[in-house]
Design a protein with these regions (language model features):
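N-terminal secretory signal peptides that target proteins for export/translocation
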Residues: 1-2
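Sec-dependent N-terminal signal peptides
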Residues: 5-15
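Catalytic glycan-binding domains that act on GlcNAc-containing polysaccharides
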Residues: 21-140
Length: 140
């Protein structure tokens, strides 16, 4: 009984500390890339449900990895650091960098979100994704 209680307490503190660490990561990334924390959290929520182990195999032969679902199309640019994507904080930072590039390149959050999702700024083609992220942002 005592072991079970200690185990439960340990798991609780692990989950709380992980949540705090991820919160810090989102804050740091938002500050670095001048993006709203709520938007970054909404992307993570939409992409993986904040699951650092999430892997999604796309139909085009690529896959998405981690909290922010970083696609393997970025492998060449991130090759020396690719294994770091398993670190949720690093994954959030890289996802924020990609979103920042998209927003800066195409001018605007909606086009940036479309670009983040598909590589194209066409909001109409990615309307469901864009509005799903924006709806999720209200939670944060």
């Amino acid at each position: 009984m005592a072991k079970r209680l200690l185990f439960t307490i340990a798991v609780f503190f692990l989950l709380v500390s992980t949540a705090r660490a991820q919160g810090y990561c989102f804050n740091r990334a938002a500050q670095r890339y001048n993006l709203p924390v709520s938007l970054l959290k909404a992307v993570a929520d939409t992409e993986s449900g904040f699951n650092p182990s999430a892997i999604d195999y796309d139909g085009n032969g690529t896959y998405d990895y981690g909290v922010m679902q970083i696609n393997t199309i970025w492998y060449k640019q991130l090759k020396p650091y690719w294994n770091n994507l398993a670190d949720p904080c690093y994954n959030v930072m890289v996802g924020s960098w990609i979103l920042y590039r998209c927003v800066t390149r195409f001018g605007g959050i909606k086009k940036g979100l479309a670009c983040y999702n598909s590589g194209s700024p066409d909001v109409n083609a990615d309307k469901s994704y864009v509005y799903k992220v924006l709806a999720s942002e209200r939670k944060f």
